[in-house]
Amino acid sequence: MDELGIPVYKRGFPEHLLRGYEFTIDVGTKIESVGGRHDVTKIPEMNAYDIKQESIRTALWYNPIRNDGIVLPRVLDITLRGYDERRAVVESTRHKSFHTNDQWVQWMMKDSMDAQPLKVGLDDQSRNVAHSLHNCVVKIDSKKADTMSYHVEPIEDASKGCLHTRTMMWNHLVRIETFHTAQEVHILFKPTYDIVVHAERRDRSQPFRPGDQTLINFGRGQKVHMNHNSYDKMVEGLTHLVMRGKMPEVIRDDIASLDEICNRWIQSRHDPGEVKAYELCKILSTIGRKVLDREKEPEDEANLSIRFQEAIDNKFRQHDPERLKIFEHGNQRRDEDRFYILLMIAASDTFNTRVWWSNPYPCLRGTLIASETKLGDVYSMMRSWYDWSVRPTYTPYEKTREQEEYIYGRVNLFDFVAEPGIKIVHWEYRLNHSTREITYAQGNPCDLYPEDDDVIVTKFDDVAYGQMINEMINGGWNQEQFKMHKILKTEGNVLTIDFEKDAKLTTNEGVTMPEYFNKWIIAPMFNANVRIKHEEIAQRQSDDPMVKRTLSPITADPIELQRLTLARFYDIRPALRGQALSRQQAQSTYDEEISKKAGYAEVLKRRGIVQIPKKPCPTVTAQYTLERYALFIINYLQQHVARDCDEEAIYEHPKADHELEIFGESIVDISQVIVLVFDLIFERRRRVRDVYESRYIIARIREMRGKEKLNVIAEFFPTYGSLLNGLSGATVVQDIMYLNFLPLYFLVGDNMIYSHRQWSIPLLLYTHEVMVIPLEVGSYNDRCGLIAYLEYMVFFPSKAIRLSKLNEAHAKIAREMLKYYANTTVYDGGDNSNVVTTKQLLYETYLASLCGGFLDGIVWYLPITHPNKCIVAIEVSDERVPASVRAGRIRLRFPLSARHLKGVVIIQVDLGGRFTVYSEGIVSHRVCKKNLLKYMCDIILLKFSGHVFGNDEMLTKLLNV
């Protein structure tokens, strides 16, 4: 057949009369526009795709479960490329057979980040699959529905410099935490306590005595507030305090739900069947999120939640030994208290240590928060009232803390509701040296001993470091046991100090503040300065994460933020605001603020953007950020190879080279940056490889083990590979410096989970000597990905150290490092495909609300079998942009196999049901009227002159070649 008819009908036309047609368009079913824009808030009600109506940042982590299956818009492009690259194999029977690179095809499909969770209508009688658009409904025979996919686009706004073909790039940057803003960690009195002045003293030399209730400045029952004189006296250690549980209003309803479960349990005479662990866990998680919402939670949160539910079930069993002890007759306590005590024991056992407010798991911190509203300081009460103590098997043990009470808790400054002027406690964090004037000869070694008497300095513990090195030399790299915090001295250890735990209330001394309070701590190995101090709120809470809340905020520069390795001192969020589904809404001020950065126009000029918008589209910010980030990474790493240059010339470091010449593809993915680093620095190639090749190179390197991994590296990067192979004969420090490039292959990926969050990898650190340090790539102390690694690379040795001879220990260390990287699986903790790969539709829908509005369409591919095999794309869409533009966008879906797309048909339907048809390539069209009995509809006749279409199982065959 060389002609295809597509009926277009309105409401009232009997659909069963069109049963013989494989593709129909119902223009009578539509979603009314609002304000000239498609009403995308109706998407959850449509037979379209699975996006929930919720906060945009919450939507990023939504697992689409209300769908009928996931499709890949580019599956034909991938499989056709695989078909094109078939290899002929002569079998034993002398017959020739063809085989595709199945490994590549499967990887490409798994690696696709634009999967669509379709939510369609299914008609059992007609066997049709219905896809809703805002202006019509498209129905297709189920036999041919496997190539259907949505084609939605946000309309560009010229005033914002939009380039919406880069939406995927924006999606990618958010996934690798490079399109984020930050707020410094904020600490305040726990809202679960009323803190009351019980007694006072005139100076700290006068101890508090049991039973003493002497008051000097305050009346009986005076509560301590941070903006009150009572707080100042407390900080000075002049007040003795008592704590009582208090109910924060934000969780009142949730605590009431817990009380209902508790009351049922009590009334049933402690029947464990009344304690529904799943229901409890949901409520406790809600409490944990409301009080301290980190938005992004640990990947293993679901598994831990299951373990917590099991611990609850075990602890409430009537014959559990600890439960029996808590219910001893001599213990005259309330059953309500026992209920929360048992929950806290279950939470502590699940985490295998004491639970704090800063706990990353919402169900566990929610348990602590809920228990504090009833019991005050929970662990102190458990020890004094119930004789329960933390177990010796807990890590860390923290038994000594049971004699103390803790009044401060961490909250998220993004969500903290407070008026300007309110006093808070917060961490400041800035780079120790943003840039330095250096020469190649002197290098930029890390100065471990800064001269400043007024600061605390984080220092290496020489004994602990020596023990680690001996263990490494004798037994290889121990990724599970080697930790950075273990080789630092206790004083000023920025990986272990914790104000929430270090500021405490004791019986004899009142509140004691840690020695480091209000003092700068210089951590030279992290290039970091941190200080905790009192500060004031400067701005009210906002859904815009870019709003800086304090008078001394953390940096807003996207590249400088990549340099702040110590994640424990700040919180991050994607620079997005508003709802996932909205017709029109304000965007974050992030993009506008970033556009004010020095060099902004210079960086964008490299991308061909000359006219700089005042309020840029996020796609402009994404291009700026990745381009500048790439230049910074290259600048950092160029310092680690031998160079021919004026060794005494003074230059600023680090500093991105905006004049660096590179060619080829535009950089749209961090994988291209990583591959370019090796191509440019080692192979002297300035051409940027395309995104698919770059991602595949990294995937191939990761999947190999041992010698095969090194062979694959050498296959793609021969010069670098030869340097690694020559490591066994290394004689000077420069010979082993190339090892520090290896983490680039393993640290970053937008659908990657680390095998373990606390595993460490080895890295060379250049100080007055060459050291090796454990880098915990996914720990709670560090940011993930390259952010955990990059700032260590700002340090590089002087020429004298580069050329100094290796000692025996360094040579052995280098061999062990190479052995570790050849076999590491630190990146191989699985993936989160259902969540991560299905967000492209979300980004496009959300971006439409920030820019010019929303376009939707659905694409079907018709296979041509004669005279040449090819395909024709047929799209049904709205009429809001020219059909030729839509056709061009469809061609962009075929970057790998464009030669197979020989024709495009665009059927555009407006809100009134009127339609127009556009065709190009091997297909032409005409529109006719068709009478069926007393009914009339339109028929779009598509003519494929000289070509025959068919082959319903085209995709099935391609996937099985």
Swiss-Prot record:
Annotated localization: Virion
Organism encoding this protein: Bluetongue virus 1 (isolate South Africa vaccine)
Keywords recorded for this protein, A-Z: Capsid protein, Clathrin-mediated endocytosis of virus by host, Host-virus interaction, Inner capsid protein, Viral attachment to host cell, Viral penetration into host cytoplasm, Virion, Virus endocytosis by host, Virus entry into host cell
GO molecular function: structural molecule activity
Entry's Gene Ontology BP terms: clathrin-dependent endocytosis of virus by host cell; virion attachment to host cell
One GO CC annotation: viral inner capsid
Principal location listed in the UniProt entry: virion
Source taxon at top rank: Viruses
Family note: Belongs to the orbivirus VP2 family.
One Pfam family named in its UniProt record: Orbi_VP2
Keyword Lipoprotein appears in the UniProt entry: no
Protein name, per record: Outer capsid protein VP2
InterPro entries: Capsid_VP2_Orbivir
Task performed by this protein: The VP2 protein is one of the two proteins (with VP5) which constitute the virus particle outer capsid. It is the major target of the host immunogenic response. Responsible for viral attachment to target host cell, probably by binding to sialic acid. This attachment induces virion internalization predominantly through clathrin-dependent endocytosis.
